[in-house]
UniProtKB/Swiss-Prot annotation:
The keyword Plastid does not apply. This is FAD assembly factor SdhE. InterPro entries: SDH, SDH_sf, SdhE_FAD_assembly_factor. GO terms for cellular component: cytoplasm. Monomer. It comes from Yersinia pestis. Pfam families: Sdh5 (PF03937). SUPFAM superfamilies: YgfY-like (SSF109910). An FAD assembly protein, which accelerates covalent attachment of the cofactor into other proteins. Plays an essential role in the assembly of succinate dehydrogenase (SDH, respiratory complex II), an enzyme complex that is a component of both the tricarboxylic acid cycle and the electron transport chain, and which couples the oxidation of succinate to fumarate with the reduction of ubiquinone (coenzyme Q) to ubiquinol. Required for flavinylation (covalent attachment of FAD) of the flavoprotein subunit SdhA of SDH and other flavinylated proteins as well. Belongs to the SdhE FAD assembly factor family. Keywords: Chaperone, Cytoplasm.
Length: 88
């Protein structure tokens, strides 16, 4: 997936678990444009992971082995925490 194809990335942000939608969608909407190209690639790679893995990582029940994915999970968590709750 290309880093500038925002429609496809937005669609990939839609997950099968509401908990993931609450974490991933606001991050994409509010933060994606400010990411570096490398961070955008890591975000896209993260979206290719299975929902159970994403859920566990974002809820601090484990972490990805890949260091770039780990950094992206931490970035999503910190930016979402700083922004506060978002109604969906």
């Amino acid at each position: 997936m290309e880093i500038d194809n925002k429609a496809r990335i937005h669609w990939a942000c839609r997950r099968g678990m509401r908990e993931l939608d609450i974490s991933i969608m606001p991050f994409f909407e509010y933060e994606y444009d400010s990411l570096s190209d490398n961070e955008k690639q890591a975000f896209i790679r993260l979206l290719e992971c299975d929902d159970p893995d994403l859920f566990n990582w974002l809820m601090n029940h484990g972490e990805p082995q890949d260091s770039e994915l780990y950094q992206m999970v931490k970035l999503i968590q910190s930016r979402n925490k700083a922004r506060g709750p978002v109604a969906m």
